[in-house]
């Protein structure tokens, strides 16, 4: 077994695709309209679906906003430099909700940003000299 994708419902697919592609650097892997069901699916990610977990962005044509509720936490993305990643988000007009810095009670550098629908995304800075992130999050 392996994790295939996480699905997020989005109110404006074009805004979301712009954010995930141009701000976070993901690639659009595939996109398909379903006119009978009045929805579109778009899959984005850093690698191919055959060997990477990706995001499925679902746009229901008749829904502009969603109530995110209080159960959703965040998606985590490894970055080389969390400080620079936050600056890139700001330059693109994105929302940084927690500036880059060490996590509480630890040394791992993290930051939080929001996508156009308000979903939180955590940046976890890769540790120097380490090929994997420290999976300690706040």
From Swiss-Prot:
InterPro entries: Glyas_Bleomycin-R_OHBP_Dase, Glyas_Fos-R_dOase_dom, Glyoxalase_1, Glyoxalase_1_CS, VOC. Gene3D superfamilies: 2,3-Dihydroxybiphenyl 1,2-Dioxygenase, domain 1. Ni(2+) binds at residues 5, 56, 74, 122. Its cofactor is Ni(2+). Its EC number is 4.4.1.5. Belongs to the glyoxalase I family. This is Lactoylglutathione lyase.
